[in-house]
């Protein structure tokens, strides 16, 4: 027979290692097979025939010798080049069928074409045509578990033909079939040979081997005999390697098909997928909720500081090494008058505060009394009743005052108008001349409405018996010069008191400190919530490792039909990313819902796109990071080893 052989094996050896033990399975196999031959390789169990088949089909590599396929030295090819060679040249028919259990008959047949980059419509049409030709047209949507052994083997044959199957390698194709089904399979193989396929059957049964034109018998890893049983009829036109699409379209198809296969695999074990999703959902929803609550708390604090005014400077008595600022008696109302003379000062309000006992009728109530001057009520605190609001009432120790809404509700539970009425403050009758606008909770959670405001002189002498003040609140004209004004106030008071006995802060710096503290708290809350996301990521990795272990044979089938390492890597990474993306999306929705529920319950919540995007991105990154190791493990499997797994 003229021409170079399609397959040439030269002194092929194969050794397996088990620890320090080396076992040589093939011993110097030399063999030629020409295109279009129908060859049977026969041997008993342990003879090395399956190992030889794995080497012939590029599922495994020899330890020594040369393997030339169509004149190309296969030993020089890397894993992905071998995958391409398998995809373009070989079709495999296995004894155990090796169909993907979660896929339909048509989807199983399409697998080789997926990795060849064949467009979806074209491969569906070809798969249906092959199954129709094998009398399985009414079983396209059936899964392997719904089919008989003979039907499954015919699906395996259709899959072998999907990319052309220039060389058909059939490993014990009738071993798991009844006699009639086995006869049908052998007739199909004979028909494929007559159509130009090179058919190599691996078998232990002589009656099967006798159906081939050439019988090669192997024993103990060596060729025992090579017999041509009849005149070899080589078809006039043998098949050529399968052509594939290339370029960007192929890469896009790779990703698209990987996404479809990933979602298909996730649906196949929905309960486990849901359990895996829960970890990501809980993690993402926790991050979104905690960041929303943390941002809301930060915004609340800043809003309250802004409500107090960022143009304010607070002067308090303080001295290094001296405890109890309220006991320092050097800050006096005259200091406020001096501060008012500074160029950028709009107002300077001295204030004295203390706890007092209020009484009306038989109701006693403890509240906070603030003694201040007219600027306090006219510039900082809004009053509902101004008809009695005259500066003269701040002088001459007049016993009058304004009540906060909390005090009004406590002392006047009937809802009557308190203006003009009298109450006792520290057993001294005071006339109520106004009420204060509600302020709500203050910085630190204090009730700003639990207060009674009285003239400064009245508070100092009648209520607290002192001449000094507790603080001076300064309002500036230009907030951009607040730091300069603060320094001027400090210098003025140091000069007046002959020593440094005051502490001065401005609300702008307080706001900055509060903002920094709020960010720290938000980060802390987010970090605590992120721990649950990390746990969810570990769950993804565990499930993916289990999935790789369970689907090892499926991985082998995909590799045998032409999947490259990157195809397997991409599929399992996308499975992990799909879990994380779906869980992340659900987690974001639930997190926003939980934040809305918290807002409805009265908590301050801050919504922004950033934390939501961050949580989703973290979930996506979690899937990528924790899915990579299982995916890499899957892609590193040897096809022959994966196919032999249980």
Curated annotation (Swiss-Prot):
Its main location: membrane. It is an enzyme of class 7 (translocase). GO terms for molecular function: ATP binding; ATP hydrolysis activity; transmembrane transporter activity. Its EC number is 7.6.2.-. Belongs to the ABC transporter superfamily. Macrolide exporter (TC 3.A.1.122) family. Non-canonical ABC transporter that contains transmembrane domains (TMD), which form a pore in the inner membrane, and an ATP-binding domain (NBD), which is responsible for energy generation. Confers resistance against macrolides. Homodimer. This is Macrolide export ATP-binding/permease protein MacB. The gene is macB.
């Amino acid at each position: 027979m003229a021409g170079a052989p399609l397959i040439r094996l030269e002194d092929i050896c194969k050794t397996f290692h088990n620890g320090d033990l080396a076992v040589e399975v093939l011993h110097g196999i030399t063999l030629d097979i020409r295109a279009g031959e129908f060859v049977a390789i026969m041997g008993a169990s342990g003879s090395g025939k399956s190992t030889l088949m794995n080497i012939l089909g590029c599922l495994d590599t020899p330890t020594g010798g040369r393997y030339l396929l169509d004149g190309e030295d296969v030993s020089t090819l890397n894993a992905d080049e071998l995958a391409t060679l398998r995809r373009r040249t070989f079709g495999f028919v296995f004894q155990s069928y090796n169909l993907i259990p979660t896929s339909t008959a048509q989807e199983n047949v399409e697998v080789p074409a997926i990795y060849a980059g064949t467009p979806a419509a074209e491969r569906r049409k070809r798969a249906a045509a092959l199954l129709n030709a094998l009398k399985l047209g009414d079983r396209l949507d059936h899964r392997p578990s719904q089919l008989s052994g003979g039907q499954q083997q015919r699906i395996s044959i259709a899959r072998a033909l999907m990319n052309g199957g220039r060389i058909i390698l059939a490993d014990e194709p009738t071993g798991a079939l009844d006699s009639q089904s086995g006869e049908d399979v052998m007739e199909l193989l004979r028909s494929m040979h007559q159509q130009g396929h090179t058919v190599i059957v691996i078998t232990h049964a002589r009656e099967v081997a006798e159906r081939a034109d050439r019988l090669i018998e192997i024993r103990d890893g060596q060729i025992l005999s090579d017999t041509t049983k009849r005149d070899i009829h080589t078809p006039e036109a043998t098949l050529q390697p399968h052509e594939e699409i290339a370029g960007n379209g192929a890469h896009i198809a790779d990703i698209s098909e990987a996404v479809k296969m990933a979602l298909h695999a996730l649906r196949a074990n929905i309960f486990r997928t849901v359990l895996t999703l829960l970890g990501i959902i809980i993690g993402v929803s926790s991050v979104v909720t905690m960041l929303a609550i943390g941002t809301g708390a930060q915004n609340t604090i800043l809003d309250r500081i802004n409500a107090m005014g960022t143009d304010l400077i607070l002067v308090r008595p303080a001295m290094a090494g001296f405890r109890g600022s309220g006991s320092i008696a050097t800050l006096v109302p005259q200091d406020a008058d001096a501060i008012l003379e500074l160029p950028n000062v709009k107002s300077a309000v001295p204030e004295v505060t203390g706890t007092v006992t209020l009484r009306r009728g038989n109701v006693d109530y403890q509240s906070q009394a603030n003694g201040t001057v007219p600027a306090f009520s006219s510039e900082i605190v809004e009053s509902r009743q101004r008809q009695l609001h005259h500066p003269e009432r701040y002088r001459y120790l007049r016993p009058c005052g304004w009540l906060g809404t909390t005090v009004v509700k406590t002392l006047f539970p009937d809802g009557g108008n308190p203006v003009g009425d009298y109450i006792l403050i520290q057993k001294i009758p005071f006339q109520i001349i106004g009420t204060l606008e509600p302020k709500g909770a203050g910085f630190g959670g204090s009730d700003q409405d639990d207060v009674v405001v009285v003239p400064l002189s009245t508070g100092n002498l009648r209520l607290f018996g002192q001449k000094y003040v507790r603080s001076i609140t300064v309002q500036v004209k230009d907030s951009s010069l607040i730091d300069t004004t603060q320094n001027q106030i400090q210098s003025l008071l140091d000069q007046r008191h002959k020593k440094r006995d005051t502490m001065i802060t401005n609300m702008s710096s307080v706001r900055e400190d509060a903002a920094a503290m709020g960010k720290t708290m938000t980060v802390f809350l987010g970090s605590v919530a992120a721990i649950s996301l990390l746990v969810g990521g570990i769950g993804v990795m565990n499930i993916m490792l289990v999935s790789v272990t369970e689907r090892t044979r499926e991985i082998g089938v995909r590799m045998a039909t032409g999947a490259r390492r990157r195809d397997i890597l991409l599929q399992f990474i996308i499975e992990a990313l799909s879990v994380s993306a779906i869980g992340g999306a659900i987690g974001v929705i639930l997190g926003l819902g939980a934040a809305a529920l918290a807002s409805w319950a009265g908590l301050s919540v801050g919504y922004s796109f950033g934390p939501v995007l961050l949580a989703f991105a973290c979930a996506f990154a979690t899937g990528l990071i924790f899915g990579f190791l299982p995916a890499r493990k899957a892609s590193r499997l040897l096809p022959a080893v994966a196919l032999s797994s249980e």
